[in-house]
Amino acid sequence: MLESPWHPLLSQPATEAAIALLGCWLVRRFADGRVIRGRIVETEAYEAGDPACHGYRRQTARNRSMFGPPGQVYVYQIYGRYHCINLATEAADLASAVLIRALEFPDTEAIAGAGPGRLCRFLAIDRQLDGSWLGPTSPLDLEAADYPLGTLIQTTRIGLTRGVDLPWRWYLAESPAVSRRDRRAEAEQMGVSV
């Protein structure tokens, strides 16, 4: 079985890995030699036992990669047109993953990576990459954070009908690429009045 070099970081529960991934760079390598890097600025966690988790009820052909060992890529499609990239976490055979919600791309408008559908479109990530591995010879990899993160905001996830009250979304307050800000959480966590 393959193992991602990022296995140690991703062997944590999704709620811990989601925080640890902030500031890291998601690297996309293309067959023509191009490489695009985006700094991870927003994540959401999904764990076994969470009613919003795709693997909450059972493993299926569609969500199989979510049950993969830490570092396996889980890509799914929503609304029949947008793709979302997740990284399997914690342990094999356990439904646990981190959704990459937003990336900040150097020298590119913030809107390009503001949301899972946009960042996947910008990086040409689709179901063909589902089940792949993070690593130096893979189309997808991570690089360590290389500068201070700034202010970390914790709040609830977006667009759910179940598990809506779980505060399992994190983002870097200073990033212009955050998909949706929670001004109340920012005020509370940064000590500023609304």
Swiss-Prot record:
Report whether DNA repair shows up as a keyword of the record: yes
Q: What top-tier enzyme class does this entry carry?
A: hydrolase
A GO BP entry:
base-excision repair
Entry EC no(s): 3.2.2.-
Q: Which InterPro entries match?
A: Formyl_transferase-like_C_sf (IPR011034), MPG (IPR003180), MPG_sf (IPR036995)
Respond yes or no to whether keyword Hydrolase is given for this record.
Answer: yes
Recorded GO MF terms: alkylbase DNA N-glycosylase activity; DNA binding
| Keywords assigned by UniProt, alphabetized | DNA damage, DNA repair, Hydrolase
Family statement: Belongs to the DNA glycosylase MPG family.
Q: What is this protein called?
A: Putative 3-methyladenine DNA glycosylase
- The species is Synechococcus elongatus (strain ATCC 33912 / PCC 7942 / FACHB-805)
